[in-house]
Amino acid sequence: MMARLGDICTVVSGSTPKSVVPEYWDGDVKWITPAELDDDSYIISDSVRHITTLGVTKTGLKPFPAGTVILSSRAPIGKTAIAGCEMYCNQGFKNLICSNNIDSKYLYFFLSSKRDYLNSLGRGATFKEISKTIVENIEIPLPEMAEQKAISTRFENLMKLIRLRKTELEKLDQLVKSRFIELFGTENEFNKWPCCTIGDVADVCVGVVIKPTQYY
């Protein structure tokens, strides 16, 4: 069974309080921008910048609740995350508040796998953007809720495994670097070893150019 996102989610966006009004900024209200999402984004519960309740009121911002699937709609298109708590956003999003018919994690993994497709839907001359209508008309396979949750769990476990392997590789890289420094020192400590030129310990050979008309 296929379903339109507009039939199973409420699509919402946001806006930016005036930057010239200091009373709107540096409060305790979470307010995100697309730049805060990256390839490792999953559940986010805080923002880089914060606004005040006055900024919320004067700008007419509407909050989206925990569990909302966050989707960047421009600059760039297709970054995704899940809101870990109630927050607000700027105009660079088309976020999806899920109904009881769809699991937010299932929707997150679906959209994460469709970044190229989402980018192909972008419209605009100066920079591409996907509109609310475009997002609402995207279709998604919609199995029973139990199957959605089972799929989400499998992808979550895979994500954990990938992150574990990534951490292990980073630790191994640091181990190799520290071992190298331990053996050879830093770039400023080479005088702890005898030094010589490459020519002293190896024969340097070069190739020649063969004229193709003569030898082929």
Can you name each region flagged by the protein language model?
Residues 40-42, 80, 149:
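Short helix/loop capping segments that flank catalytic or ligand/cofactor-binding pockets
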Residues 6-21, 35-66, 199-215:
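Sequence-specific dsDNA recognition surfaces
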Residues 158-169:
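Amphipathic alpha-helical coiled-coil segments
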Residues 1, 30, 69, 87, ...:
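Residues that recognize and position ribonucleotide moieties
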Residues 15-16, 74-77, 82-94, 108-143, ...:
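Glycine-anchored helix-breaking recognition loops at helix->coil/strand junctions
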Residues 33-34, 48-112:
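A short beta-sheet element
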Residues 1-15, 137-152, 167-209:
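Non-catalytic DNA-recognition/assembly elements of restriction-modification systems
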Residues 102, 145-146, 159:
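A generic structural signal for alpha-helix starts
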